[in-house]
Amino acid sequence: MKRKHIMIYAASLLVSVLAHAFFVKEWAEGRYMTGPGDGLAQMIVFKKLLFDQYTHGNFFYNYSFGLGGGTFSQLGYYFSASFLFLAVSAAVWLLQAVQLIGETDTLFWAESAVFISIFKLSLIIFTSASVFHYLLKHRAASFTGAVLYGVSIIYFRHEAYWEFFTDTMVWLPLLVLGAEKIIRERRPAWFIVACSLTLINNFYFAYINLIFIGIYVLFRWLIRLEPHEEKRWIQIRLFLVSGFISFGISAAAFVPVVYGFLNNLRPPYSQKIEWLNFDDNILFSSRIIIVPAAFLLFLFIISFYKNRVFRLFAGLSLLFILFHFSPYAASVFNGFSAPQNRFEYVLAFTIAGAAAAGLSQLSELKRKELLPAAAVVLLLYLYHIQRYKLDIWKPANESILLLLLMTIAALFAAAFAKKRAKMAVYGIIILSSLFVANSYQKYALSEGGDLDSVTKEYLTSEEYRGRESSELIRRLQKEDDDPLMRIDWMNGVRNNTPIIYGFNGFSAYSSILNKDLLAFYWNDLSIDMGRESVSRYASLGDRANLYSLLYGKYYMTEKTNEASVPYGFKKHLETEHYAVYENQYMLPFVKTADAIYSESELDRLPALAKEQAMLKGIILKDPSGKTEQTPKPSNLITKSDITAKQAQYQNGLLTVTGENGGELIITPKQPSSAPGDYYVSFYLKSKAKDKGFTLKVNDYVTTRKSNKSIYKTGVNNITVRVPKSGHISINLPKGTYELRNIALYEENYQTLKNAVMQNKTEKADKLNWNKNRLTFSYHLSKDQYIMLPIPYEKGWELKINGKTQKIEKADYAFIGFKAQKGDNHIELTYYPPYFKISAIISLVSLLLAVFYIRRKKPGSI
């Protein structure tokens, strides 16, 4: 690396450290640069999961991810293919190898967040400074613009809450460099490299980046920067061929990850989207972008528009400022879904480019131009103060006004003194950016966004990962060394609790999940999760049949919540605050069946009928042979009294009038004396436009989203299991609800007990799960189906006695397959969907890229 590049990177690193000054101070005091929401629930959790996997040579599948899943494809939106995460992981692994660091748990990843961010931001500043210098040939202006881009508030917002969002800020400048190399020099190498990197790292932000680069190229065709640029048809050919090669190179990562995204289940966004909304104050208080004063001043200096680079980036910035105020544009950048302002880093980049171009023209700055520009900008700030009724004496607002005045003063000095004042302008802009960044960290993120609550004390408390609960789980795992057993426990609403603690559980929280599992929860078995969400599944609704079917051996709970313990679970271990219950009706991990049920025949039957069918046999979508008659549990609602308390119920409408809520009470007239549970199901929808609510059914509590929430499932059919009692109370807060299709079923668990008796003599032999491969032997006395409590997903391959066999989706969401009489040596292997063919495409495309680049410009990129 040339000395000048070393100097630029050293300066980038120094600025990055200064930009993190507040968070470094917080780290020293035991507070971390990680959001209290998704930061603790996903970011540090997935890094722990993937680091543990990768360092053990397991790159594709994890049985502990929810009910089991392909982590390469389902976590591709996060870190699984991130070059920056892989680089950090390699460094951490080396530090572990020389014993400089210890356990890489969630606490470690929270503690290291600020240092990873410093490294990443230094790369962002370095790459963008290099690209701006290529465009401007002015190193100081380019570096100052790069600082504006790197330390923009959207970087710190995204890095703190959703760390992987900021990876794309490294690749965006490289894409621009690649486009410029094609337009100016007919050299495709940089574009192929940058496009491949962005496609591999994150398909979502690749989508945003490629939209931007398309817009950038269109602007470049309108604004020529060099007199001898390639003809457009040549550019188009180079872009198309280079883009095609880039997609090929990225295929091994891009294809499986995009398949994972397409295999997700999200209800369509049905709310009206506005074209324009100007509510956000981008000069003072926006949580996404604060427009730098220097950029605004430069916009109104007419002579700067003679510089084509300034004209280019100013035009792009004005367009993206308009996009910022357009929810419809935010929807387009979010894949035509709910509006999300995740694309604003592009605006930060174009503003930085315009500022850098303006700074390169300081020697041309005239006083007579600066005066009206300053007047217009001051009026803009005064307008925003008036419109948003701001208190200018608040520290944050006062600081922005002070920085504005300092910037104006520095520019006037530059207009008078020219060369002598230039460095003062650069210095004030950089210092202003650092000041705004650190102020934003303190007031918006730490105090306003609760990052100050993310402490070492919290991360080692019982609210997150405490000693008492950890030791209880370790005791249980030491006592029962079955590596496949599942424990149902969630610490509060943290669905990724099993990953945090290191056990196999029943819950997961991720933006991308197996759609068959989500459908299993939402629709097929109507399993209430205690919290409505499109990106989570949790527990099994305390339903004993499902625990036995899915190898749920233990149920852990706080002692204050023991009323929810499923039927057939007996207390096994306890501490002062927690108790673990053991399932007395366990079914084997490998289950066999010859009774076949049809999904379509069970479609309109209650969840209890489906559970009983799964216990008696196997449910298939398209069974080829004879099917069994479906179970038909009796609906007891016609033999029950229904009364309302602190509410009125008429024609399927429940109006709750009580200030503390009201209830609909179901009382069976002739209750059975046999032990067991009730399953109560109903359709429930709030009539309130924008208000979530809590539903209680006896002691069971669950929450439902607002009708306007983008995270609402749109599923309003609810089934709740309650222990047998004299009555069932459906309790709701004050309001009006559509409540209909009420049904009540009794479960005495005789079907479960029969299934346990029938499966006691059958047992898989030599069962071994190693990374992405499961092997076992099974002797059958006749041809039967074998079912496994492993989620069905594309990528599984099956061999029986060395021959490839077909895997079927059984019991709505799990693996099933036919096996023959006699000995069956079974091998199941998982690779990400289309991984093998995609890997071949990547290799061929890489070779093609080398040939193509050398052919275009030998020895040059």
Swiss-Prot record:
Principal location listed in the UniProt entry: membrane
Membrane topology, from the record: Multi-pass membrane protein
Entry GO CC: plasma membrane
Localization terms from the record: Cell membrane
Membrane-spanning segments: 4-24, 75-95, 106-126, 159-179, 199-219, 238-258, 282-302, 313-333, 343-363, 370-385, 396-416, 425-445, 833-853
Keyword flag Transmembrane helix: yes
Coiled coil start-end: 738-766
Keyword terms of this UniProt record: Cell membrane, Coiled coil, Membrane, Transmembrane, Transmembrane helix
Name the record gives this protein: Uncharacterized protein YfhO
Organism: Bacillus subtilis (strain 168)
